[in-house]
Amino acid sequence: MRGRTMSVIKMTDLELAGKRVFIRADLNVPVKDGKVTSDARILASLPTIKRCLEAGAKVMVTSHLGRPTEGEYNEEFSLAPVVNYLNDALDCDVKLAKDYLDGIELNAGELVVLENVRFNKGEKKNDEALSKKYAALCDIFVMDAFGTAHRAQASTHGVGMNAAIACAGPLLANELEALGKAMDNPARPLVAIVGGSKVSTKLTVLESLSKIADQLVVGGGIANTFIAAEGHNVGKSLYEADLVETAKKLMKDCAIPVATDVACAKAFDENAEAVIKHVSEVQDDDMIFDLGPDSTAVLAEIISNAKTILWNGPVGVFEFKNFEAGTAGIAKAIADSEGFSVAGGGDTLAAIDKFGIKADVSYISTGGGAFLEFVEGKVLPAVAMLEERAKA
């Protein structure tokens, strides 16, 4: 997948009028007391749905929601709250179809939401018979859920292999374009920022990025392992002694600026006082929770000179006010940068919201696991399927 332009059919290039269009969206939103509590994913999918309706297509949209027992209907995981939301957002009569696998009737310009795909036996295993039933419902299959593109399931992969036409929806196409721009042929220097608690969970990401980034910035618990690799005491900080040698190797392969000063405390507590120390002064009972001001300034300078920025993970315990300065400084530098920036991952999005820089990031990825697997250089099954169908 790396180093080449992905060739897929785009929904925006197709004639949709009168066609039965099956959209696999990501409408996996939090629901409380029958109401959608965070509508970000629905909002992201609305332009695709509207475009199909305005073109006069017969529109079906579906998604998973939560983790119900497969093959069993469970009202707690119904897409009914999403249907209610769409009724208001689109100002039209949106129906919910529970039993649709043997066919469904709808008119041009009409929208039907097909109930949670995980209520169908065989969804997760990419069952061939189920995939063919989905495919029989439509003339055009639209894959628009980047967040599930790394899973080969019946509604993300199998249906596309069997549908008459399989294409990428606008949301997915934009995502692939932005990630491709950041990783396949980036304007340089490319600066990658990887935060998080453990090197082990991000090891393949770090190894992959060390090969393409001009500077690889590490933060959070990951940074502590690199500080230890430079021979410094990290006290009681979260770090992985067994990966110190791996960190040393990564530092040989790529420019990784390691913190020179850090914010420490004696306990993991929101009200703990942040004490700024040079890395050589960290004591046995200290815990490192953030970058110090000097290190943050150095990284901000590196980011300001970048032409491409890839951000995944905060650089400190930004949820605590006393340990948010490092992540806030990184966020501000990205916001002020004139380079092309892509950010992804749950904690990263929370940091973007907290520091109010959403409008200043060039592209915010909607996929957690899919974003990481793309960055690792892995082939995403749904994307591979779209590429294969584009050749046919």
UniProtKB/Swiss-Prot annotation:
Single GO molecular function: phosphoglycerate kinase activity
Per the record, what are the reactions this protein catalyses?
(2R)-3-phosphoglycerate + ATP = (2R)-3-phospho-glyceroyl phosphate + ADP
- The UniProt record gives the binding positions of ATP as K202, E319, G345, G346, D347, T348
Give the UniProt subcellular location, in the record's own words: Cytoplasm
User: What GO biological process terms does the UniProt entry carry, in alphabetical order?
Assistant: gluconeogenesis; glycolytic process
Q: What is its EC number?
A: 2.7.2.3
Positions bound to substrate: D26, L27, N28, R41, H64, L65, G66, R67, R118, R151
Q: In which pathway does it act?
A: Carbohydrate degradation; glycolysis; pyruvate from D-glyceraldehyde 3-phosphate: step 2/5
Per the UniProt record, which residue ranges are transmembrane?
none
Top-level EC class: transferase
GO terms under cellular component: cytosol
Disulfide bridge positions per record: none
Keyword terms: ATP-binding, Cytoplasm, Glycolysis, Kinase, Nucleotide-binding, Transferase
Q: Do you know which InterPro entries this protein is assigned to?
A: Phosphoglycerate_kinase, Phosphoglycerate_kinase_CS, Phosphoglycerate_kinase_N, Phosphoglycerate_kinase_sf
What quaternary structure, including any partners, is listed in this protein's UniProt entry?
Answer: Monomer.
* HAMAP family linked: Phosphoglyc_kinase
Q: Which family does it belong to?
A: Belongs to the phosphoglycerate kinase family.
Q: Please identify the protein, giving its name as recorded.
A: Phosphoglycerate kinase
Q: What is the lineage of its organism?
A: Bacteria, Pseudomonadati, Pseudomonadota, Gammaproteobacteria, Vibrionales
Q: Which gene encodes it?
A: pgk
